[in-house]
Amino acid sequence: MSRVALDLGFIKIYYYTIFILLAIVSATYLIIKESRKQNIDKDFLINTIYYVIIFGILGARLYYVIFEWDYYIKNPLEIFAIWHGGLAIHGGIIVGLIFILYYCHKNKVSNLKFLDIVVVGLILAQAIGRWGNFFNQEAYGAITTKQELINMHIPQFIINGMYIDGNYYQPTFLYESILDLLGFVILFLTRCYPYLKIGFLTGLYLIWYGVTRFFVEGMRSDSLMLGPLKMAQVVSIMMIICGIYFCFIRNIKSKKFENLYQEGGIRHEV
């Protein structure tokens, strides 16, 4: 299966790049649309999105390179070839989160309210971005048979794409993409519930994606490892714990319901 969507001779456009860009555009559109309802300062919003995209991509790449250092120390120029794949979403989330917390604090914007807006677009972006993994033939699971994939009603073009180096593999990218899309629907519908507390959507995202990634990662055969541990599963457990705190423990302490779309602004509520 070709990774190249368009070959212009002087430049090649990869499917991976296309889906990453689609993911970024989709998330940006949703975040801007939702932010307008909260009267977020335009300059703050543009600057935040701009830097989060940059730092998120850098963080995702750095995270991947660190855990594949044995390869990249021998092929240093490949560090910059992100179109070949190798963006670890956990790295992007961690670095992006650090920047958002810093920038919200600097501008006196409620970080949790802003994150409640961001996570809705983020999980949709993750669902789209996983298709870049498909065309790069990465993020796949254990060896299986063609008949088993047919029995699971996997589309033929995906079955063909999961034929790698003489074997068929489980399309774990597809499982995660579907679960991310379902998570998006849940977050999107939940966001307007009249009895939400600030941080609940952020917590729900952390729990949903943490559980999703933990189980999908258990099926993958190309995981980033930290000794005997699958690093993504370690981070997923931490996400679930943080999500439980924001959804339940923190909310129990807060007696006030603060629905995003009934408050009319997110400033000065850090």
Segments predicted by a language model, with ranges:
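A feature for loop-to-transmembrane-helix boundaries and adjacent hydrophobic helices
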Residues: 1-270
